[in-house]
Every structure is written in structure tokens, then in C-alpha cells.
């Protein structure tokens, strides 16, 4: 599957509020936690086996438990030794936590997912056993389902065949039914997952049996089988084993398609980070930050005509499916709200929370303004600048706050679109982009951008609004 398709489809799922993540061991290994073969290396050696040669590691853990008189005490200690330490979260965790993803499933015992969510100033609810499934915290932002338990309750973790068989009990079956429900109603992205978990395989089979070809599409990112991984210390390349693993991967990808899981293969794990960044960028570009302030509405001949332009712009952006965030700038804030409200009213929808976010600056706390601006802009992927003037000592001057918002937008990797014909700071910023256009836009968009420099007559306001929307839509296709 082409990664551009994955980026497009999963960002759309986030926008619709039905995206979910399924995290396997690979998501944590980059930070220093061990893989299953590494975890069971010493136990396997003790009972005369080699964890690197075993594919059924659940049974290997069961064998070790059996050889220790049916006690899993030593296994519990091995888990504590390997997962008890709190490690730093990865960039991938941070990217995911920054997105409005409300559901995580994981087989990992560590705390990296919930830790990253808290660092993003969100409140996760962790459900690590079946007794917690029926309760939901009303103030929760994200639910993290830990279907194999948590290192803080090591004796309840799932690692042996005995533990997996508990999922056939009525109590543990609730976890399976909850996951089935999410797989039916949400779009999952599987990360760091090998698809060797017997519970998940049975759940996917149950869904496939019921829905047949009507299953919901899901996505997975896997690293390619690379030749360099089959070269030993003496530079001997094991062609036979390499070909075997290639064939096995091809068959696995084909098998996953039965469950409507589409696989994207990458050459290097760093590409996963790039894909997640692209997903975030694609999602954020559906949210537009409108920066502006005005006491003078030149080139318009009256304040009402200038405000009408802002209202029409907000209306058309909302109508085109964009969410708007604004600091409720001086002289334009009401018009932004009015434009969005009118568009929603035409759709017979009164709720505007999902399409408009207002974050006025605390006027009595100027020392906090930069942080407020950073937080507002971080919600968006495109910044539009209109007008940009204010009164200072009785004179109309350029709004320096808009210049700062431009700089913060660039820092946030936003696409920046100053509407040059509205003068003030917007014209200053428009000229700045003109000087080094390729630093901000693809050259193919130059004519569309330059069309925003002048307003010949007030009668062409509707035309200018359409030109702005057309430029924004073209950016989405980039």
C-alpha cells in the first residue's frame, strides 16, 4: 500500500473522531525496552531452548513456568527487571499524543503511552483489567486499554499460555468484546505489532466471519525485510534465510488483507516518524488560524465593508470544511464568529464547538501572551493574516502581535497566507513571502498567491474570497 494513501485515510479518520492506535512492543523498543525474544532469552536457555529460534513465545513462557513447578514467580521478576524502570517517551509517542486520538489498545506492559498523553496535558484513563471496563472518568480525554496488563500489577500480566486461556473466561472475555466493538467502529493504525498474538488473531477472525467483505479498513506500518539483517560478523550473506523471510512476509501481508488490514512497508524505522508527522500535518491543515486586528479597514471604504469581507471569508472557510481557531483579534473577532454561525445556521446546526475555537488573549496578563499564541497556533496547520493595524499614542501603526504570530506559525510549520490587499502587517508579511517565495510555497502556487496582493474594486470581494479558498484547497492537495 502506498504511504500517501495511509496518510490521507488515517488523517481523515482522526478528523472524523474515529481513529484508534494499536501499539505493540516495537513502539517501546526504540526507547530501551526489550523484545519478547530478548525477554525470554535466559529462561529459554535454562530449559535447553533458544528464544531466537522460537516463533511461539507464549508457549515458550508456558514451558518455563511448567519447569518451575507451575510457579510464575521468576517470570514476574524478569518482567519487573525489564519493564519496571521508567524510560523516556519517543518522538512517535509525542506525535500521537498531540493528536485527538481517543482510543489506544496495547499489549505493552510499560507506561510510555499514558506518560506521553499526560505530557501533552491530556487526561488518560488506563484500563488494565476487566473490572475497570464498566467505569469511565467523565473528565477523560483518552482511554488506554492494556489488554495484557500493566507492570504495576505484574502478577496479572498476560505472558503464558495459561494467561491467554483466561480470555476464554466470561470475565476476561469482556476485553475481547470491547476490542471487537472498537475494531468494528474505529479505524486502527497498528504500530510496532507483529500479529503473532493469539487473542487478536481470534478476534479478527470472529469479525471477518460475521462481516465477510464488509470489514472496516485498518492500517499497519512494518519495516521491510532487509538484506543487511542477514549478514553475519564474517560478512556472510544468508541468501536462503533472506528469501525465506521475504516469502513469509509476502504471505503475512496477503493474510492480513483477509482482515482488511493494509500494510505499508518502510526501509527504516525513522520513516514511521516521518509518516506520523505527515499524518499530523495533514490533519492540522484542516484547521485554520485567523490572525488579525484592525481599527483602519483600508482598502475598504468603510468599517462595515471591511468586516463583511472577514465574515464572508470565515463563512466560506467553514463551508469548505475547515475548522477555525482565533484569538478574537481587535476589530475582526465578531465577524469571524458571525461568518461561522451563519454557515452553521444554514445547515440547521447550532453547535459550533467542532468548527470554531476562540482563545482571546488575557489582556491583564501580557507576560502570558506568547505562550497563549503558541498554544492557539499549535492547534492549526494553516495561518491566514488579515489587516494588522492598531492605535498607539493616537496613531495607527502596524500590529506587532501579528508579526509575532507569523513567526510562531512558521516555527509550528504552518502554511502562512497573509492577505496582502488588507494592508498593515498583512502587507508586510505578504512582501516578506514574495522575497523568498520558495521558502514558503511550492512555485506552482505563485500566481494564486500573487492574486491576493491587490483589491482593485470593492465589487470583487467575493472573487477575492474565492481566490483565498482556492489557494487553501490547493495547499491540501500538496
Curated annotation (Swiss-Prot):
Changing residue 373 to A: Loss of NADase activity, not activated by 3'cADPR. InterPro entries: DHS-like_NAD/FAD-binding_dom (IPR029035), Ssirtuin_cat_dom (IPR026590), ThsA_STALD (IPR041486). SUPFAM superfamilies: DHS-like NAD/FAD-binding domain. It comes from the Bacteria. GO terms for molecular function: hydrolase activity; nucleotide binding. Residues 1-287 form the Deacetylase sirtuin-type domain. Residues 288-478 are annotated as: SLOG (STALD) domain. One of its GO terms (biological process) is defense response to virus. Changing residue 361 to A: Slower NADase activation by 3'cADPR. Pfam families: SIR2_2, STALD. It is an enzyme of class 3 (hydrolase). Homotetramer in solution. NAD(+) hydrolyzing component (NADase) of the Thoeris antiviral defense system, composed of ThsA and ThsB (maybe AS248_15445). Activated by 3' cyclic ADP-D-ribose (3'cADPR) but not its isomers 2'cADPR, cADPR and very weakly by ADPR; binds 3'cADPR better than 2'cADPR. Upon activation binds and hydrolyzes NAD(+), leading to cell death and inhibition of phage replication. Belongs to the soluble Thoeris ThsA family. This is NAD(+) hydrolase ThsA.
